[in-house]
Amino acid sequence: MRRGERRVAGGSGSESPLLEGRRSTESEVYDDGTNTFFWRAHTLTVLFILTCALGYVTLLEETPQDTAYNTKRGIVASILVFLCFGVTQAKDGPFSRPHPAYWRFWLCVSVVYELFLIFILFQTVHDGRQFLKYVDPRLGVPLPERDYGGNCLIYDADNKTDPFHNIWDKLDGFVPAHFIGWYLKTLMIRDWWMCMIISVMFEFLEYSLEHQLPNFSECWWDHWIMDVLLCNGLGIYCGMKTLEWLSLKTYKWQGLWNIPTYKGKMKRIAFQFTPYSWVRFEWKPASSLHRWLAVCGIILVFLLAELNTFYLKFVLWMPPEHYLVLLRLVFFVNVGGVAMREIYDFMDELKPHRKLGQQAWLVAAITVTELLIVVKYDPHTLTLSLPFYISQCWTLGSILVLTWTVWRFFLRDITMRYKETRRQKQQSHQAINNGDGHPGPEDDLPGTGTAEEEGTTNDGVPAEEGPSAAS
């Protein structure tokens, strides 16, 4: 929504938020409605600057004779023109801070990335890998073999110099990356249980797929102590504390020039990088079959996106420390939060004609396209059969989940309806026996048993006072 369309507090004497249409999980917002130059779309300004830049390149700059350079420059210029159009003209998403144009930019980057993936998908395996040389000449060569796992002793008595060398070897740059990554994922998902399930499930996936990717082979304490408990667990804990603060925060906004003090202005600038309002996510997966399947789908896509990170590096011959790997993670950090909010709104929307948000649609398409690239570029690795005990564990887990689903959303409801019907019948029979029920069919017939039950004759005379009694 545009800046001028946001909720504005009404009345000059009191700050009363507009509560109409606000969900119970959504925070109250006070806004004075200031619409400054900063919030405008600047469509004509961007068009003028873009036209001047293109005119300068066309009329004043000499075109180089290097075909490869001109090709790269033309592709980059085409992408920049598309980004300029999208940033000024694309539809706004659910987020507006620090600026709606920021999120429109990442939406357009999503389109560019998806088109790039489609291009790679339609190349041969050799051409696709060699094409990356145009991005970085160091790419397009097979990755060297590395030794993973190795000695898993926490205390290595044979190493007299440093018995804990195995632990220090694991304390690399991936430790803060795990912590920061799960802190940000918690801000996206906004649910402790879902975060922990995804964290634990991914470790099980690493166990299951280490025969396909050697870098999944880690020590047991690296999986469960360093990853799940320390890095991931601490990131989730800090993320939940941040969510608690955001849900309790007062969202009161004033225009920068309406604040009299310099301290207030600086505070307002800092708060520009915090949410405009806050919605507490209540996924409630067990409330209905629809929400249960949706939450399972979200977890599946999350795990698939995590696996794509490692498989894409493997099949495209990309070193883990390459900047393209980092850029992909930065990309998903920015688009993931918007996608999760759009999915939650889609699930929470009661309108009959719902539409999935644009960013969520693109994230799903990107995740599937990445998987298809992995399948096409190295089918041999993906078809390596799981060890028998691993496949047994996943089969048992799938049966348990399927059994719980059938019981919770089908058998349990049938059983509860049967018990409720039986209880109502018992209450009805008990009420009739106690004389508190409604008249039955026989009670509508005149003179049938009514006199005997009431101790009267059919003429309404008490039985003791009738002719037989007098005689």
UniProtKB/Swiss-Prot annotation:
GO biological process, one term: phosphatidylserine biosynthetic process
Pfam families xrefs: PSS (PF03034)
Pathways involved: Phospholipid metabolism; phosphatidylserine biosynthesis
InterPro entries per UniProt: PSS
Transmembrane regions listed in the UniProt entry: 41-61, 75-95, 105-125, 292-312, 314-334, 355-375, 382-402
UniProt region (Disordered), positions on chain: 1-26, 423-471
Sites where a glycan is attached: N159
A GO MF term: CDP-diacylglycerol-serine O-phosphatidyltransferase activity
Reactions accelerated catalytically: a 1,2-diacyl-sn-glycero-3-phosphoethanolamine + L-serine = a 1,2-diacyl-sn-glycero-3-phospho-L-serine + ethanolamine; 1-hexadecanoyl-2-(9Z-octadecenoyl)-sn-glycero-3-phosphoethanolamine + L-serine = 1-hexadecanoyl-2-(9Z-octadecenoyl)-sn-glycero-3-phospho-L-serine + ethanolamine; 1-hexadecanoyl-2-(4Z,7Z,10Z,13Z,16Z,19Z-docosahexaenoyl)-sn-glycero-3-phosphoethanolamine + L-serine = 1-hexadecanoyl-2-(4Z,7Z,10Z,13Z,16Z,19Z-docosahexaenoyl)-sn-glycero-3-phosphoserine + ethanolamine; 1-octadecanoyl-2-(5Z,8Z,11Z,14Z)-eicosatetraenoyl-sn-glycero-3-phosphoethanolamine + L-serine = 1-octadecanoyl-2-(5Z,8Z,11Z,14Z)-eicosatetraenoyl-sn-glycero-3-phosphoserine + ethanolamine
EC code: 2.7.8.29
Protein location: Endoplasmic reticulum membrane
Lumenal side: 62-74, 126-291, 335-354, 403-471
GO CC terms: endoplasmic reticulum membrane; membrane
Lineage top rank: taxon: Eukaryota
Sites bearing Phosphoserine, chain numbering: S12, S14, S16
Predominant localisation class: endoplasmic reticulum
Cytoplasmic topological intervals: 1-40, 96-104, 313, 376-381
The keyword DNA damage belongs to this UniProt entry's keyword annotation: no
Record key words, sorted: Endoplasmic reticulum, Glycoprotein, Lipid biosynthesis, Lipid metabolism, Membrane, Phospholipid biosynthesis, Phospholipid metabolism, Phosphoprotein, Transferase, Transmembrane, Transmembrane helix
Recorded topology in the membrane: Multi-pass membrane protein
Role of this protein: Catalyzes a base-exchange reaction in which the polar head group of phosphatidylethanolamine (PE) or phosphatidylcholine (PC) is replaced by L-serine. Catalyzes the conversion of phosphatatidylethanolamine and does not act on phosphatidylcholine. Can utilize both phosphatidylethanolamine (PE) plasmalogen and diacyl PE as substrate and the latter is six times better utilized, indicating the importance of an ester linkage at the sn-1 position.
PANTHER family: PHOSPHATIDYLINOSITOL SYNTHASE (PTHR15362), PHOSPHATIDYLSERINE SYNTHASE 2 (PTHR15362:SF7)
UniProt family annotation: Belongs to the phosphatidyl serine synthase family.
Annotated protein name in UniProt: Phosphatidylserine synthase 2
Classification lineage: Eukaryota, Metazoa, Chordata, Craniata, Vertebrata
Gene name of the record: Ptdss2
